[in-house]
Amino acid sequence: MKVIVLLLVLAVMQPVIQSQPFPGTGELPMTRRPPKKELEYWCTYAKSCDFCWNCRHGVCKNKVFEKHPLIKKNDYIQICRVSRYNERCSYFTDTRIRRFHIMSCTNPTYYDWFDELMQVKEDRVIDTENIKHTCLCMIATIALIGYIRKQYSRMQLQAATRLLIFLGLYVLLGILMTNIIMNLPLSTDNPMQMRRPPERDLKFWCTYAKHCDFCWTCKDGMCKNKVFSDHPIITQNDYIVNCTVSRWHDRCMYEAHFRIHYQHNMNCSQPKDLEWFIELKRHVINQDDL
């Protein structure tokens, strides 16, 4: 009970503690936006943070670097918090997936947390050997569960111990089944591989998977849409994500490859435009900070 009370007190005090300045020289409390005089510093090393951008009608201009190209308002721009304590400067993204970076204030290093978050392999091929291994493990698990159930009456164990054993086995079985389902063949021409779409299918995929890299041609940091010529040119950033696609009968699927893989399945003849990237990175913006 004492531990629970202590945790509740800490939870209540946390906002108060965060709002207080850090002790020492040159302190900056954990705040959503740095002072204007420090914008050039922070926007050099935290380029994706929202306090570096002025957005209007879906187009964003960099507050600090006038020569920076205009970009479309998208999820490359993240809500950030910054702080400074003596020679330690830090910033992190205030999203569901929080990314923290601490650096020396006098000798900072540029760290693209978003780039690392989105780091992926160029192609993903389903490993058939892994599927075989998973199936064997599932069969062995089912056999083990059957054996334990048969010996249930002979086991001289407490009821709680028996329950934990069965729960553990069923969780393992569930994990194995999920692994198999996620590796089911989905492509008719090459059922064991997700791949880039052919040129003739680009218009379809780029309508419903707008962020996928196969929809864009990038050169010197500027990206042009391959399909829709009237789409504005955007700067090359992590709004564009590596993707692979697959089609099986009337089931179409595309997958975004980053550390948290996201898959979207849809009816090929009646597809649904799903902004998976926006849903994943959705966050609440404090209107007072706009």
From Swiss-Prot:
Residues modified by glycosylation: 242, 267
Alphabetized InterPro entries for the sequence: ASFV_fam_110
A GO cellular-component term linked to this record: host cell membrane
Keywords: Glycoprotein, Host membrane, Membrane, Transmembrane, Transmembrane helix
Predominant location: host cell
Bilayer disposition of the protein: Multi-pass membrane protein
Domain of life, per lineage: Viruses
Pfam families hit by this protein: v110
Similarity field: Belongs to the asfivirus MGF 110 family.
Name assigned to this protein: Protein MGF 110-9L
Organism lineage string: Viruses, Varidnaviria, Bamfordvirae, Nucleocytoviricota, Pokkesviricetes
